[in-house]
Amino acid sequence: MLSTALNAETLTIERIFSSPSLDGNAPRALKVSPDGERVTFLKGKQTDYERLDLWEYHIESGETRMLFDSNDLQSGEEVLSDEEKARRERMRLSGSGIVSYQWSDDGKALLFPLGGDVFYHKLGEKGAKQLLDTEAFETDIKLSPKGNYISFIRDQNLYVKHIASGKETAITKEGGGNIKFGMAEFVAQEEMGRMTGYWWSPDESKIAFTKVDESPVDVITRSE
C-alpha cells in the first residue's frame, strides 16, 4: 500500500492578495512593433514580480532578451506624486519600475517613463537617453506623431521638448491650484475612461488641450 504525504501550503485570503502573484511572473503590456519584427513586453524580476523591466522577443530569430533593467536606470525607492498614483489606479497599472512604454509611429524608437522622468531609446543604438531629469514628477508623457518631440504634464501645465535639440517649451504657464491644463479631470477619468487632456495633430504642428477650473467645486473634508 502506497501513501503520499501532501505538504501543500494552506491557501489563505491574505496569500491570495499578497505578492508574489499566484499566477506567476506573466508578461504584461505586450505590443507588436510597428514594423512587425518584434514583440515587446514588461516582465517582473524573478526576485520581485512587481518590479518591471522592458523585454523584447524577436520574431524571426526567436530570441528573447531584456532591453532595459529598471534598476540600472533608477536606484532607490520610487516616490509617486498623488496625481500619478490616482492616474495609475484608474488605468489599472500596478507594480514599479517600467510600468508603461510606447513605440514611435515609425517603429524606430521607444519611450518610457521611470521614476517621474523620461527615457528614450532609438533602435540600433545602445542604451537609453534620459530626456527629463527634474525634481518634478512628469505625467502623461507622449511621443509626437512624427517622433520629433515629447510632450508631458508638469505641475499642471503642458510642456513639449524637442528630442534632438533638447529645447523645452511651456505651452501653458497658468496651471496650479484649481487650474489644470492638458489633464483629464476626475469625472473624465472615472466615468468616461479618458485619461488624457491633450492631443497632437497628425502632422505634429498643433496640440489641442483642455483647461479645467475646479474653483466652483466645494472642498469637503473626508475622514477615513
Task: Map each language-model feature to its residues.
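Beta-propeller folds
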Residues: 2-224
